[in-house]
A protein has these predicted regions:
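Single conserved hydrophobic/aromatic residue that forms the stacking wall/gate
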Residues: 3-4, 8, 423-432
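Solvent-exposed loop and beta-edge segments used for protein-protein assembly and interaction
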Residues: 313-315, 341-343, 363-367, 387, ...
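Intrinsically disordered, low-complexity Pro/Gly/Ser/Thr-rich segments with frequent PxxP/GP/PP motifs
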Residues: 328-364
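Extended substrate-binding grooves/exosites of carbohydrate-active enzymes
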Residues: 2-5, 9-300, 304, 308-315, ...
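Acidic glycine/proline-rich low-complexity segments
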Residues: 178, 218-220, 232-233, 237, ...
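Low-complexity, Pro/Ser/Thr- and charge-rich linker/hinge segments at domain boundaries
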Residues: 2-5, 9-12, 393-414
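Terminal connector regions
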Residues: 357-401
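Hydrophobic residues positioned within well-ordered beta-strands of beta-sheet architectures
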Residues: 301-303, 319, 347-349, 371, ...
Length: 433
């Protein structure tokens, strides 16, 4: 660790990760090699660089594929006792009933699990961090589990989030790890606690039409050096293949089996669909926020390339600038870029019509011009063909008409599941004022 940061070859790492359960809609927890390979390839294509195995060691094939394709891993031990400590936190049972807590009767079995986790996966270079387990509060037994990992492997870091609820054994985790903390509270914690690097082991819960505010977290990696990314909850919808009354297959969730009570579709919180394991629309947001090259349009007549890759120069990629008018491509040009890792460089916008000093061409004042600068693979890779887009930035050039606000107040209406804003649009006569 350098300056309380996690580093690889002395370069600060940012985890652009996902939590991934072992799940198939056809075979349950027994996932095939083909399904795992599709997951890995999809992750690589969408700029995901890390997996947290939640909340148990996965089948060995995924460790092999992460080694081969180049994904980092938090390898998690098989432990979660959510029910025991959750009840204690709410006061319904005494805290001394928490498992494993400080009950040393549990320690031999827990240390055996740690040893098994380590011995099986110790030779996988993809594994950067060992995780003691998930959501099991704190206590002496869990601290001893972390110490067992360190005794077995003095080179890797140890992770555990549960000390967030029990600070008696802070040394259990080598990093501060939290779940679903707001951006403002992350900033507040970093300002007040400077002892460790910080990750979100679970964040941007991907249920329903979600991930829209994800950038508020990923932007933090640029402004808070000790904030080093997070792991989306979670990767794939946990749905089960079922036939409807017409014999047609569909992906079923809670309640589709006539069971009550149920959590309904609460297990459908992935960025990939169950079944075919294809990306859902949420993946577009993930890919953009996780991209390792940023393109900014903050300087007149120029665009800025920010290379966030730890080891790759931008000359490994084709840089293509595309000019569109009202959605129709009118010009396209390749640009040679050479931006070293963790560096920034400005380039001239190649289309004169978009520059303020353009004297030869006149923009159509009513048209919308769009400049898109993208970076694409030059060569075929094991996970994508040449031409696959790894990053892009875009700016829209359009004259925006003045907005005429209503003079009448906006009324807020609170429904059972929605909040509505009601207002009266200004009349044409009002707009002429």
């Amino acid at each position: 660790r350098r300056q309380r940061q996690m580093c690889i070859r002395d370069r600060r790492i940012v985890f652009k990760g996902v939590n991934r359960h072992e799940f198939s809609s056809k075979t349950g927890r027994a996932v095939t090699r083909e399904e795992v390979l599709k997951d890995i390839v999809t992750m690589k294509q969408n700029n995901i660089n890390a997996i947290r195995t939640c909340h148990y060691p996965d089948a060995s094939i995924i460790y092999d594929l992460c080694d081969e394709y180049g994904l980092y891993m938090i390898a998690e031990n098989n432990l979660e006792s959510h029910g025991s400590w959750d009840a204690a936190m709410h006061g319904s049972v005494p805290k001394d009933t928490i498992v494993p807590g400080d009950n040393m009767d549990w320690e031999p079995m827990m240390l055996d699990r740690v040893n098994s986790c380590y011995q099986r996966d110790k030779n996988h270079p993809a594994v950067l961090i060992w995780s003691v387990g998930n959501e099991s509060y704190g206590g002496k037994v869990i601290f001893d589990m972390s110490e067992k990992f360190r005794a077995l492997d003095p080179y890797r870091l140890v992770h555990y989030e549960g000390i967030f609820n029990d600070r008696r054994y802070e040394a259990t985790s080598d990093m501060e790890s939290q779940m679903y903390t707001s951006v403002e509270n992350v900033k507040k914690f970093l300002a007040e606690h400077k002892e460790k690097p910080f990750i979100m082991c679970e964040y941007t819960h991907a249920m329903g039409n979600s991930c829209g505010a994800m950038h508020k977290y990923t932007d933090l990696t640029d402004t808070e050096p000790r904030y080093q990314g997070g792991f989306i909850w979670d990767y794939i919808d946990q749905s089960i293949l079922k036939k409807d009354r017409y014999g047609k297959d569909f992906q079923a969730y809670g309640g589709d089996f006539l069971e009550r009570p149920t959590d309904y579709n609460f297990s459908g919180n992935g960025i990939c669909y169950g079944g075919d394991r294809d990306p859902s629309p949420k993946m577009q947001e993930v890919k953009f926020n996780y991209q390792n090259i940023s393109i900014l349009f903050e300087k007149e007549g120029k665009f800025t390339v920010v290379n966030k890759n730890l080891f790759a120069n931008t000359d490994r990629f084709r840089c293509v600038a595309v000019l569109q008018k009202n959605g129709v491509v009118v010009k396209k040009q390749e640009i040679e870029t050479t931006v070293p890792p963790l560096s920034t460089k400005d380039y001239e916008i190649p289309f004169a019509i978009l520059r303020a000093d353009d004297k030869d061409q006149k923009k159509d004042p009513d048209a919308e011009y769009t400049l898109t600068v993208s970076f694409r693979l030059k060569e075929d890779m094991s996970w994508a063909d040449a031409g696959h887009e790894v990053a892009f930035g875009q700016k829209i050039y359009k004259k925006i008409p003045a907005f005429h606000a209503s003079e009448k107040p906006i009324r807020v209406v609170h429904g059972k599941v929605n909040i509505c804003l009601l207002y009266t649009s200004p009349s044409p006569r009002d707009m002429r004022r």
